[in-house]
Amino acid sequence: MTREHQGGTRGLAAARKGFWSGLRFTSLRLRLVLVFGLVALTAAVSASGIAYWLNREAVLTRTQDAVLRDFEQEMQNRAGALPEHPTQDEVQHTAGQMANSSQRFSVLLVAENADGTAVYGSSGGLGGVALSDVPESLRTAVNKEQKLTSANKHPYHLYWQRITDDGTPYLVAGTKVIGGGPTGYMLKSLEPEAKDLNSLAWSLGIATALALLGSALLAQALATTVLKPVHRLGVAARRLGEGKLDTRLRVSGTDELADLSRTFNSAAENLEKRVADMAGREQASRRFVADMSHELRTPLTALTAVTEVLEEELEYAGEGEGEGGSFDPMVEPAVRLVVSETRRLNDLVENLMEVTRFDAGTARLVLDDVDVADQITACIDARAWLDAVDLDAERGVHARLDPRRLDVILANLIGNALKHGGSPVRVSVARADHEIVIRVRDNGPGIPEDVLPHVFDRFYKASASRPRSEGSGLGLSIALENAHIHGGEITAENAPEGGAVFTLRLPQDPSPPADEDGGPDEETEDRGKDAKGQV
């Protein structure tokens, strides 16, 4: 199969798929077309049936009346002129004359000769009408003498019947000559009338099909007209769901669909105002946090310097114990508390400033070639976690990352595992599809299912009763933002055998391809260049 043929086949398949998807059985368009079609079909079939029946009766009645009238006249004029006891030749000759009338029917005459024997005369000779061709019920009715009354002046009457022989319709009639004489039977083919009626039926069928097709096209046009505003409303609703809050519908008319469009526009406008108000409040709160963080940083720097001096004094006092320490034993716990809380406050302010950088979009990567195993070891060693962490990482796994931000991610993940899951914490490193995969698994009970979706939310705590010393609720959020700025991701789940597992995925080289002018990406900086954007 050639490529052009394949493309044409795919295009045809797509067109068929689009057609059937547009006419799916649950669609309003198809239901409208079906309803219009059924109504049109019912009306057309009813009208065609009535028209066919009326025309059929009119055609058959007109032909039948003309034939019967002519036959009755021929019976009185020609058959009535026969002698009382005619011969075979006389009867045969009269039947032939009667058959040559304007209506051209076949005739059978039955008379009695002088010795009482029945004499038959057929217009077609031996191949003409036989008495056996006449239904017995008709012969009985013709030969039955009626009682004479004031309303019935003659003992015998004309009777007729429609029959079908070998698929051809016939009109059969019979009567006796008034005043006495032979009995006559007439056979008239109705095949020309049947052909005319068949042509009429075909014409009515074609008209019905055309009416059905026209109604389907009309229904399609009406459905398009009716559903076009609904389609526009659906498109606008999807755009609104995608966050395009300025989406509005053009309203025209005063019908129900126009009212629906006005309601949508009003709801969209109110939603846009609410979202803008919420965004303004969020922006104001972020500015407040950023301003407060910067305002707190200056006095906190001085306070941190003082606490470092106090901490050194505590160390000297401990070394000089027995020779007269400089701290009162009652004051020493308070000093240690001040030092600890000052450090915690300093960490909180630094975390808040980090968050404000992410929100403002000013965070930058300072990339360097990093041995991942060495980086993890350095992170664990700097925090004295070597005895509580099992590291499964071979050396030589290199990636181009920001060492400081990777250290922040690892410190938060491992520290969180030690704090809430307990030791030993297992850290493993693997490579998969140009990615570095770092898994941190603790030895605790795992994360509750209702908490899992919120572990990376800012300031989220699983319980409001948790002690405030357990953290600010920003660590995992900052770790996730640092992973995102690398183009990576962090996921949290519970291991089947117990314990929580945090999986960090980072690309080995997060730098996007250089632009055509060779300029570096604005979101990253090389270690060898100016690093003033480092946070």
Swiss-Prot record:
It is a multi-pass membrane protein. Residues 224-276 form the HAMP domain. GO terms for cellular component: plasma membrane. It catalyses: ATP + protein L-histidine = ADP + protein N-phospho-L-histidine. It is found in: Cell membrane. Residues 526-535 have a biased composition (Basic and acidic residues). It holds the Pfam family HAMP. InterPro entries: HAMP_dom (IPR003660), HATPase_C_sf (IPR036890), His_kinase_dom (IPR005467), HisK_dim/P_dom (IPR003661), HisK_dim/P_sf (IPR036097), Sig_transdc_His_kin-like_C (IPR004358). GO terms for molecular function: ATP binding; phosphorelay sensor kinase activity. It is an enzyme of class 2 (transferase). Gene3D superfamilies: 1.10.287.130, 6.10.340.10, Histidine kinase-like ATPase, C-terminal domain. Its EC number is 2.7.13.3. Its main location: membrane. Residues 514-525 have a biased composition (Acidic residues). PANTHER family: HYBRID SIGNAL TRANSDUCTION HISTIDINE KINASE C, TWO-COMPONENT HISTIDINE KINASE. Forms part of a two-component regulatory system AfsQ1/AfsQ2 involved in secondary metabolism. May activate AfsQ1 by phosphorylation. This is Signal transduction histidine-protein kinase AfsQ2. It comes from Streptomyces coelicolor (strain ATCC BAA-471 / A3(2) / M145).
